[in-house]
Amino acid sequence: MKIITDVTNNVLDDEAATVLLSTFQISPQNTQEQAVRSAMKFFTVNGFVRPAIDYAKAWPNPSKAHLFAFNQGNPFPGQFQGDATHTVDALYQFQTMAHLFPTQVDKDIGVDFALALIDFAHGIENIPPIGKDGTLKVWGPNGKPGRIMTLDQDPYQLKKELDLIKELGVLKVWGIMGGYLTAP
């Protein structure tokens, strides 16, 4: 965590650094488990969620850009149980461990998600274009099946974090990530 706090303080002014670090609960005083969770959220928001939204919004023809959000948490016991991350969506998407999902709700949302992606890949537009309204299809949390939402409805449950990144500037925050990843 010291690396992230040091890089953040080098890239941003004091006030912005304090807000960013507190929003993501990043502190040198974190326990190892807290540090991993805070870093995971920071990198998930900035490495996956924010770029996906920005790329979809920047697409030259918004009727040809589609965005989905898989926000179902990890169903398996352990440190990351309940957390929705990029690897969890792949776990549900590919269905290779579906027989190990602990509940029928997990199995059902996995099938719904996987079939929607397969259909979409075969030209069935069951995931609407993002358009000017920021429309996307969302699965989860808590077993909620795929449904249509807009970005204004906070489908990722990360509005505070995403708004802050937008305010500070995506490239500055990516600079913090890059500084962390290249630190010794």
Over which residues does each language-model region extend?
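C-terminal structured subdomain/cap of oxidoreductase catalytic cores
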Residues: 83-132, 138, 143, 164, ...
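C-terminal domain-tail junction helix/linker
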Residues: 144-163
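Short, surface-exposed polybasic-aromatic patches that bind anionic ligands, especially phosphate groups
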Residues: 169-170
